[in-house]
Amino acid sequence: MNIWLSMLTTTGLGAIIGGFTNHLAIKMLFRPHRPIYIGKFQVPFTPGLIPKRRDELAVQLGKMVVEHLLTPEGIGKKLTNEEFQKGLIHWAQVEVDKVITNEQSLRHMLEKWDVAHVEKEATEKIEQVITEKIQAFLEEYYTYTWEQALPHSVHEKIENAIPNVSAFILGRATQFFESEEGKARLSKMIDDFFASRGTLLNLVGMFLGNVSVVDRVQPEVIKFLGQDGTKQLLTEVLQKELEKLKGRDVKEVETFVEKEMIVSSILSAVKVEETVSKFLNQSVQQVCEPVRETIMEKVVPGVVTKGLKWGAENVASILNNLHLAEIVQQEVSTFSTERLEDLVLSITKNELKMITYLGALLGGMIGIVQGLLLLFLK
């Protein structure tokens, strides 16, 4: 009976000592958090291992993350993974679709995104671009003659149109002189002519008798305007003037219309401010609807694919510029010892318990061996 009690005692003591020793060793990894002094003498094993080596641990964790966890190869492989790309494209399409189907006005959306004075800035920018383009166009074309400035096809169209222009001018002139207004104007011209000639009017009156001069002149004017020869004459005059115009410089337009007036007239016709205002008052859905399918089926997948490809090709440079090791080191260095202890224990809690139990098991086995040795020695 005493023998079995001795074996039980040695086994129990061995288990207790083994378990407690391992438990104490685990605790000494973290405790105490600060060095303990007796006078000027620092108690050995204080502070605990992890508090004492926290800075070194932070450095090593940073290196481990960069060299073994977040490696360029690993991230690059993930970025080029087909399933990952499909998932990211789908997510991007969903998010983009939420934006482009929004019924709020474009102006309201921009204000939500803190884009201020967009209407004023857009108007000024567009007007500036238009002005610069017009001025550049005029600067270039002012160095040309009209023959150089206009395409050959335009010259042909103008030349072919001259007979029709002549017919149009003569037709309108005929209509005018056939009207009462035209007759009155012709009468005034005749009166002014004879008024400057004095007695010539009396001499003409003797020949014409009671018939007024305008009644005799009007039919002749109309007859003259309707003759083919008159049309041919006017056509030849217009053709000669066109040939003269071809050799003249475009810059001569400035003598009639200043460059600034041309620019101002075009800007007034375009109505940039009104156009921009109408555009911003449209809903995002109205603006994007014509191109929604293109955005969803082509633009979004294309942008995501190219972005991932660029990221995979430049991942090493990106990681270097991020300085991940320094970030991890700085974050770990800011952890309190208590937080660091909780972090490690939350990960290794079960394993550390098993180490304690293993110590108790080994201690118990040693106790059994001691009991057996005592038994044989007796």
From Swiss-Prot:
Q: Where is this protein localized, as stated in its record?
A: Cell membrane
Q: Which domain of life is it from?
A: Bacteria
The GO cellular component terms are: plasma membrane
Q: How does it sit in the membrane?
A: Multi-pass membrane protein
Q: Does the keyword Transferase apply?
A: no
Cross-referenced Pfam families: DUF445
Please state the protein's primary subcellular location.
Answer: membrane
Q: Read off the InterPro entries from this record.
A: DUF445, UCP032178
Entry keyword annotation includes Nucleotidyltransferase: no
Tell me where the transmembrane regions lie. 1-21, 357-377
- Name the keywords, alphabetized: Cell membrane, Membrane, Transmembrane, Transmembrane helix
- What is stated as this protein's family in its record? Belongs to the UPF0754 family.
Name of the protein: UPF0754 membrane protein BCAH187_A1042
Q: Which organism is it from?
A: Bacillus cereus (strain AH187)
